[in-house]
Curated annotation (Swiss-Prot):
The lineage of its organism: Eukaryota, Fungi, Dikarya, Ascomycota, Saccharomycotina. The gene is CFT2. Disulfide bonds: none annotated. Residues 586-597 have a biased composition (Acidic residues). This is Cleavage factor two protein 2. RNA-binding component of the cleavage and polyadenylation factor (CPF) complex, which plays a key role in polyadenylation-dependent pre-mRNA 3'-end formation and cooperates with cleavage factors including the CFIA complex and NAB4/CFIB. May be involved in poly(A)-site recognition. May be involved in the association of the CPF, CPFIA and RNA polymerase II complexes. SUPFAM superfamilies: Metallo-hydrolase/oxidoreductase. Gene3D superfamilies: 3.40.50.10890, Ribonuclease Z/Hydroxyacylglutathione hydrolase-like. Present with 3060 molecules/cell in log phase SD medium. Keywords: mRNA processing, Nucleus.
Length: 859
């Protein structure tokens, strides 16, 4: 059997996706995109040759490295996704992937009110709504459609929801592990490669190949030691009104570092230290990462939750009024000590460095040895590495280096477009959306026709979509038309955009009252070729809104109605854009917001504050501010022109380099991978980034290591050592089964092997000619070849002792596991295949021998 593997390169010089081709199915794994290296147009040009061949996409991590191109691909190749391509990922990867995509695209100007706009915020949301959410160890069974294909996701231990994928067919088993961590950190358990006893997981043993990369590794120091160094660095940086800047991936390491900062502040308040230090978050996605984290606690380490439950039942992601969601130009509003988490994208990092990088009171903590999406941080790393004296202690000890140099940084200047340019851009955008929606609607109808077996059905929803096509397109700044068209037959009632669409139609009903259509109940037309499930009258159940965790409940109906003092919008569920607060909060809430989040002497005040922050998500300022509102990224009345220029900036800040990555270290990787006993290890391209030392160790252990080239298909062949044979039902009725233990039965099988062709699936699906082996009964004239009897089973001396005791014999163990019966007969196990019964011929000897043979099955 063969399979083909290809490392995709869109021009960045690195692997931005992996394509695995089996006989009748092609998988794309982790399609990434780095806007700082490859432009939007170049990326589309590359993927337009790849996507038409793809059937399934799987995502392993919520970082840009693994899903940066997903929304881009869905938007530009929607017809392929609607008609064929299924995307699978765990729920945290879906949620946090939205955050990383918004940050990356907004930094590059792909979304937002700019003249470089290519997508809307709604397009990103819709692309992630298409992904099928999974749990760990949940089987994705595609065997009937793709000839034995199954997918299983296991915990990778790097990011929340990060996965190691096991891809299996009838003849192959591939393990894909791009990033993984064998030890637990502050919020996540270790990867599921090893079980509780330290042995490799049986379901991952002996794969055809392990697909991984050896370019990044974590520190060999224990996590607790690195965490202590990190907290000590924070304390030192906050002293003397200092500021700490932490660039971090908001969908990756941010939650781990945030909980460590929370622990530091919690412990410091007990000794009245750092009681008023704000925690600032600078991200285009604002506070969505924390909001998602609060709804995904079951994906985190139970020990973390237990620890914080014991701390007066607080949450690791609730700091109260300390947390502020700000923009870079608002940093000047927070003088003195502060902790700043900055999203690891070039535009934000550069603005922050320009604002605070020239202050000696600023400490910049770099938590990993390279930053692909922020070139300015790589330049700072190069400055530190140039000093050989400092390099000797780099990077584990967390030593502070004074950086007094000039570096060149790209800055983005935004200039408002004129009214004429804005209107022309909106008209162009309107035409583009109208054409795209018409194409999508046609693809949707064709896909539905194929799925229904060409049955003609009175599709009320489809006709309504056609009638209101122009209405939807004209409301470009309102409800996105794609929300209605893409609703389809699956989970229409679960999307809240449908309610917005109904409101939109109601608003237009007065204008088009004369054209209003009345729905008349009619029978459906059933064609002979229609599937059996469509030969029935339609049934429209009541609409019940659901999300990933069950039925959506409006909690406002359980709260007291006090419209004068209560902000109604603050009780809405999080992550609903446009839910702006209109009425001011009462004076008591404002007072609670201004107080410190860790008032140890007043638990009642803390509980009320915790409740307020949980429902409102306010930043603690005088005016109510939505924690997750991203309306500023929508194209409204004004548009800006982005101009990129380079400036020289003087740095006078302190730099601390500390490897806090949740990745496996080099020594552990060289030990764990060989324990899986894989036939080969396939390393993603390019070859020069792979660790040569570990590669040599793997080769020394007789493991075939394959370094993949970029954009070149490599074919791998696998010798089949096992065969799947089905037993014919007629032969099954003739078998005499014998039980040899509580879990196993055996039988003697004699028959003739016949090759049969498998039935074909639907004609519009891709299939491969495959046959199966069936064992059928011999003809009546045939005689089986007789050989000596073979005994199969396991002789358990403990069970034998129990049987003899029930027969009133005296059986006891004596020396080296020998079972002695009545001091006359002894039973010893030499090994698993040899058992000796020692004694003189007697009735007792025969009884013991019979009990032993009864434990075995003879064939």
């Amino acid at each position: 059997m063969t399979y083909k593997y290809n490392c995709c390169d869109d021009g960045s010089g690195t692997t931005v996706g992996s394509v695995v081709r089996f006989d009748n199915v092609t998988l794309l794994i982790d399609p990434g995109w780095n806007p700082s290296k490859v432009s939007y147009e170049q990326c589309i040009k590359y993927w337009e040759k790849v996507i038409p061949e793809i059937d399934v996409i799987i995502l392993s991590q919520p970082t840009i490295e693994c899903l940066g191109a997903h929304s881009l691909l869905y938007y530009n190749f929607t017809s392929h996704f609607i008609s064929r391509i299924q995307v699978y990922a765990t729920l945290p990867v879906i949620n946090l992937g939205r955050v990383s995509t918004i940050d990356s695209y907004a930094s590059a100007g792909v979304i937002g009110p700019y003249d470089t706009n290519k997508l809307d915020l709604e397009d990103i949301e819709i692309s992630f709504d298409h992904i099928v959410p999974l749990k760990y160890s949940q089987l994705v069974d595609l065997r009937s459609r793709y000839d034995g294909l199954t997918l299983l996701a296991y915990n990778a231990g790097v990011c929340p929801g990060g996965s190691i994928w096991c891809i299996s067919t009838y003849s192959e088993k591939l393990v894909y592990a791009k990033r993984w961590n064998h030890t637990r950190d502050n919020i996540l358990n270790a990867a599921s490669i090893l079980d509780a006893t330290g042995k490799p997981l049986s379901t991952l043993m002996r794969p055809s190949a392990i697909i991984t990369t050896l370019d990044r590794f974590g520190s060999s120091q224990p996590f607790k030691k690195r965490s202590k160094i990190f907290k000590d660095t924070l304390k030192k940086g906050l002293s003397s009104d200092g500021s700490v800047i932490i660039p971090v991936d908001m969908s990756g390491k941010f939650l781990d570092l945030f909980t460590q900062v929370h622990e530091l502040l919690f412990e410091s308040t007990k000794i009245n230290a750092h009681t008023q230090v704000p925690v600032l978050i600078l991200s285009y996605a604002r506070g969505r990462t924390l909001t998602y984290a609060k709804s995904m606690l079951e994906w985190l380490s139970p020990s973390l939750l237990k620890t914080w439950e014991n701390r007066n039942n607080t949450s690791p992601f609730e700091i109260g009024s300390r947390i502020k969601i700000i923009a870079p130009n608002e940093l000047s509003k927070y003088p003195g000590s502060k902790i700043c988490f900055v999203s690891e994208v070039g535009a934000l990092i550069n603005e922050v460095i320009i604002k605070v990088g020239n202050s000696e009171k600023t400490t910049l903590i770099l938590t990993k040895p390279s930053f692909e999406c922020a070139s300015s941080l790589d330049k700072i790393l190069e400055i530190v590495e140039q000093d050989e004296r400092n390099w000797k202690t780099f990077p584990e000890d967390g030593k502070s280096f004074l950086c007094d140099n000039y570096i060149s940084i790209d800055t983005i200047k935004e200039e408002p477009l004129s009214k004429e340019e804005t209107e022309a851009f909106k008209v162009q955008l309107k035409e583009k959306k109208r054409d795209r929606n018409k194409k999508i609607l046609l693809v949707k109808r064709e896909s539905k026709k194929l799925a229904n077996g060409n049955a003609i059905i009175d599709d009320t929803n489809g006709e309504r979509a056609m009638r209101n096509q122009d209405i939807l397109v004209e409301n470009v700044n309102g409800v996105p038309p794609i929300d209605h068209i893409m609703g389809g037959d699956e989970d229409d009632d679960e999307e809240e955009e449908n309610d917005n669409l109904l409101n939109l139609l109601k608003d237009n009903s007065e204008k088009s009252a004369a054209k209003k259509n009345t729905e008349v109940p009619v029978d459906i037309i059933i064609q002979p070729s229609a599937a059996s499930k469509h030969k029935m009258f339609p049934f429209n159940p009541a609409k019940i809104k659901k999300d990933d965790y069950g039925t959506v409940v409006d909690f406002t109906m359980f709260l007291p109605d006090d419209s004068d003092n209560v902000n109604q919008n603050s009780r809405k569920r999080p992550l609903k854009d446009g839910a702006k607060t209109t009425s001011p909060v009462n004076e008591e809430d404002n007072k609670n917001e201004e107080e410190d989040g860790y008032n140890m002497s007043d638990p009642i005040s803390k509980r009320s504050k915790h409740r307020a922050s949980r429902y409102s998500g306010f930043s603690g300022t005088g005016e109510a501010e939505n924690f997750d509102n991203l309306d500023y990224l929508k194209i409204d009345k004004t548009l800006s022109k982005r101009t990129i220029s380079t400036v020289n900036v003087q740095l006078k800040c302190s730099v601390v380099i500390l490897n806090l990555q949740s990745l496996v270290d080099q020594r552990s990787a060289s030990i764990i991978w060989p324990s899986l006993k894989s036939r080969k290890i396939v390393l993603s391209a390019p070859k020069q980034i792979q660790n040569e030392e570990i590669t040599a160790k793997l080769i020394k252990k007789n493991i075939e290591v394959v370094n993949m080239p970029l954009n070149k298909i490599v074919e791998f062949s696998t010798t089949i050592k096992t065969l799947d044979i089905s037993i014919d039902s007629n032969l099954d009725n003739l078998l005499k089964w014998q039980r040899i233990s509580d879990s196993y039965t055996v039988a003697t099988v004699v028959g003739r092997l016949v090759k049969e062709s498998l039935p074909q699936v639907n004609n519009h699906q891709k299939t491969a000619s495959r046959s199966k082996l069936v064992l059928k009964p011999l003809h009546g004239s045939s005689r089986s070849h007789k050989t000596g009897a073979l005994s199969i089973g396991d002789v358990r001396l403990a069970q034998l002792k129990k049987l003899l005791t029930e027969k009133n014999y005296i059986a006891e163990f004596k020396g080296e596991g020998t079972l002695v019966i009545n001091e006359k007969v002894a039973v010893r196990k030499i090994n698993d295949a040899e058992t000796i019964i020692d004694g003189t011929p007697s009735e007792l000897f025969d009884t013991v021998k019979k009990l032993v043979t009864d434990m075995l099955a003879k064939i």
